[in-house]
Amino acid sequence: MEFSPPLQRATLIQRYKRFLADVITPDGRELTLHCPNTGAMTGCATRGDTVWYSTSDNTKRKYPHTWELTQSQSGAFICVNTLWANRLTKEAILNESISELSGYSSLKSEVKYGAERSRIDFMLQADSRPDCYIEVKSVTLAENEQGYFPDAVTERGQKHLRELMNVAAEGQRAVIFFAVLHSAITRFSPARHIDEKYAQLLSEAQQRGVEILAYKAEISAEGMALKKSLSVTL
C-alpha cells in the first residue's frame, strides 16, 4: 500500500486531549493534527519525533491533517493510525501474503458473532472448510526489539479472546492476528506487565484452539505492507 498523495513531514511538539497533536512544519508553521489513536502511544509521541501526516480534501473537517506515522529519534517507523491495521491485514490476506490465511474464496468484514455480540474484523469462508474468524490487533509498543500488546488494560480485548475461544469450541477456526506496526520490533509477547488478565486469557485461548499470528509491516514514508511472520512467546 502506497500513501497517495504523499505524506508530509513535521516535528512533534505535543499530543494532548488524546485526539490532537501540535506539530511544526519544516517552514516554521504550527499545525494541529487529528490523532487517530486512543491508546497510550507509549514511545510513539515523544517531543521532537518526526511526524508524517496526510491532508484531507474535505473542506468541512475541523482538523484536515491526520497523523499517520511517527519516525522516532532512533529512526524507527511506527504507524500510529490504528485504522491501518485492518486495512493492511485485509490487503495481505487478499494478496495471499499470509500463508496461514490463504486459500479462502470469500472475505467479509465486521460480521456480528458470539454471545457478547461482538463484531469480528474478518471472516474467511471457502467450500469444505470451517469458517475462519480473525480478530486484528495493532502492535506499536516496543521495548528494545520486543513488541507488546496491549499498551493499556483492555477489557474489550479480553472480551474478544473469550469470544474467539467460543468460536474454536464450536469447531470453527479462530485467529488472533497481531499486526506489528513498528519497524524496530523483531519478536512479540503479550504485555503481562501491563494487563496480566489479557496475557492469561491469550495463553488459555491458545490451549483451547485459538491460533496466534504476528506479522510485521515494512514501513516507510512512502507506504506500508505486512510482510514477515514474527515469533510469539506467551
Curated annotation (Swiss-Prot):
Alphabetical UniProt keywords: DNA-binding
PANTHER family: SUGAR FERMENTATION STIMULATION PROTEIN A
Similarity annotation: Belongs to the SfsA family.
UniProt DNA-binding residue ranges: 201-220
Family matches, as NCBIfam families: sfsA
HAMAP family in UniProt: SfsA
Record-linked Pfam families: SfsA, SfsA_N
InterPro entries according to UniProt: SfsA (IPR005224), SfsA_C (IPR040452), SfsA_N (IPR041465)
Function recorded in the entry: Binds to DNA non-specifically. Could be a regulatory factor involved in maltose metabolism.
Name of the featured protein: Sugar fermentation stimulation protein A
Gene symbol of the encoding locus: sfsA
Keyword Thylakoid applies: no
Gene Ontology molecular-function annotations: DNA binding
